[in-house]
C-alpha cells in the first residue's frame, strides 16, 4: 500500500504555521450556508493542529471566480459557518500571500485559526503556477491536505505546495485513502460495484476500469437502458443513449474476458409519464416495455436477486442511483438495495464504500449513511479514483 505522512508523523508544532488545504466550497442560499458537512469533515484536522499549538491557516476555493475577485465568492461568506462548527473564533484574511498574511501570522497565537481568501481569485491557482505556490509556501512551516474532493485537480494549493513544504495527509484525507484502498486497492473478494445514474457517456471510464477490478458489476439508472437496448431490448421512450450500443457491447466483452458478471434488471418499473406516483405506473418484465412507456426504476424481483448477490460479496463500491430516486415511487429499488448493503455492513460481512453527490443523497433518503463503512462526499475525485486515474493531490503526498 502507498505510504503517506499523516498528522501522527508531526513532531512539536507549537507556534509553527500550518497551511491546511480544506474544502470550504459550501452550498449557499440567500447568503447563508445550507450544508456544513465539508466543514465537519475538516474539523478533526483543524482542531488537532490548533490544540497542538500550531497557527492554522486554512486554504480553500469557493465557486468558480475564474481568477478574479468577486465579493459574493469571498470566503468571508463562510466564516460564521466555520466558527459554528469548530466552536472557535476564526479570523478572515483577504489575501493568500504577502505582507497582509505575514502581519496576520505575527498577530496569531499558537492555537489560533484563520481562513485565507478564496484561492481561485488568483489565476495562478488553477494554472498550478509555481511562483504562486512559492509565494504561499513562504508563510508556512508545513502543509496539510485534507481536501480529497479537490485532489483530482493539479492546482497550486492542492499539488504545488506539497512539493515545497513538508506535506501531510489530514485526518479526512487519511480516512478516505484508507477506505478507497480497502475497496479497490486490496479488497476482500468477491467485490461488487453498483454504478447508476443517467448516462453511460459520463461513466464510460468508470465502467471500463471496474470490469477489470470487480466480480459483479450492477448497472442501474438510465445507464441500464443503454445496455438493455444494446442487447436488443425495446426500452420504449426511456432515457437511452442508442448511439453507444457498440460501446456497451465492448464493455460486456471486456467483463466476460475479465470474469466479471454484469447484472442488468429483468423486471422494471415503467410509466407513460415522468411524474410523482403516476396512474400509468406498472411493473413489467424487461421484454414487455411498451413503445410509449419509460423505465424509471428497477423492479422488485431484480432487487431481490441483487440483494442475493450482495450477500455473497465481501466488498461493495457504490456510485449512483438505480432509478429516478428524486421522484416517488422511483426511489424504492435504490433505498431497498442500500438498506440491504447497510444491514450486511452492520453484520460485519461487507465492507461498503459509497461516493458521489446523488449517492450521498440516496443514502440519506434510505437513512443508511451512517451504516456504510465509508461515505465519500467527493464528486469528481471519487469518480476519477473509480476510473483508476492517478489523483495529483494524492500523488503529491506520497512518500517516495
Could you say what each language-model-derived stretch is?
Residues 1-400:
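Active-site loop-to-helix "anion-binding N-cap" substructures in soluble metabolic enzymes
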Amino acid at each position: 500500500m502507498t505510504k503517506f505522512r499523516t498528522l501522527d508523523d508531526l513532531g512539536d508544532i507549537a507556534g509553527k504555521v500550518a497551511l491546511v488545504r480544506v474544502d470550504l466550497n459550501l452550498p449557499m442560499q440567500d447568503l447563508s450556508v445550507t450544508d456544513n458537512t465539508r466543514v465537519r469533515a475538516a474539523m478533526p484536522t483543524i482542531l488537532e493542529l490548533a490544540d497542538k499549538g500550531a497557527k492554522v491557516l486554512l486554504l480553500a476555493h469557493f465557486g468558480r471566480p475564474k481568477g478574479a475577485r468577486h465579493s459574493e465568492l469571498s470566503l468571508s461568506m463562510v466564516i460564521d459557518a466555520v466558527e459554528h462548527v469548530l466552536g472557535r473564533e476564526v479570523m478572515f484574511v483577504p489575501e493568500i500571500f504577502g505582507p497582509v498574511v505575514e502581519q496576520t501570522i505575527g498577530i496569531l497565537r499558537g492555537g489560533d485559526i484563520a481562513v485565507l481568501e478564496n484561492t481561485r481569485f488568483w489565476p495562478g491557482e488553477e494554472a498550478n503556477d509555481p511562483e504562486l505556490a512559492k509565494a504561499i509556501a513562504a508563510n508556512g512551516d508545513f502543509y496539510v491536505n485534507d481536501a480529497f474532493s479537490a485532489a483530482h485537480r493539479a492546482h497550486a494549493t492542492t499539488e504545488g505546495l506539497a512539493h515545497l513544504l513538508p506535506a501531510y495527509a489530514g485526518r479526512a484525507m487519511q480516512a478516505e485513502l484508507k477506505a478507497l484502498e480497502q475497496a479497490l486497492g486490496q479488497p476482500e473478494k468477491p467485490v461488487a460495484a453498483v454504478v447508476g445514474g443517467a448516462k453511460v457517456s459520463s461513466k464510460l471510464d468508470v465502467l471500463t476500469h471496474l470490469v477489470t477490478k470487480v466480480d459483479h458489476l450492477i448497472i442501474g439508472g438510465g445507464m441500464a437502458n443503454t445496455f438493455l437496448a444494446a442487447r436488443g431490448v425495446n426500452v420504449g421512450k426511456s432515457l437511452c443513449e442508442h448511439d453507444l450500443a457498440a460501446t456497451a457491447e465492448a464493455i460486456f466483452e471486456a467483463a466476460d474476458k475479465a470474469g466479471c458478471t454484469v447484472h442488468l434488471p429483468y423486471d422494471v418499473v415503467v410509466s407513460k409519464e415522468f411524474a410523482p406516483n403516476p396512474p400509468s405506473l406498472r411493473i413489467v418484465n424487461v421484454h414487455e416495455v411498451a413503445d410509449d412507456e419509460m423505465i424509471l426504476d428497477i423492479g422488485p424481483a431484480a432487487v431481490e436477486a441483487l440483494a442475493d448477490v450482495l450477500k455473497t460479496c465481501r466488498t461493495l463500491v457504490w456510485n449512483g442511483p438505480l432509478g429516478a430516486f428524486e421522484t416517488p415511487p422511483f426511489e424504492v429499488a435504490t433505498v431497498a438495495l442500500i438498506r440491504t448493503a447497510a444491514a450486511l455492513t452492520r453484520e460485519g460481512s461487507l465492507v461498503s464504500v459509497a461516493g458521489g453527490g446523488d449517492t450521498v443523497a440516496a443514502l440519506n433518503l434510505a437513512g443508511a449513511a451512517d451504516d456504510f463503512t465509508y461515505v465519500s462526499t467527493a464528486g469528481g475525485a471519487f469518480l476519477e479514483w473509480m476510473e483508476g486515474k492517478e489523483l495529483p493531490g494524492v500523488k503529491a503526498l506520497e512518500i517516495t
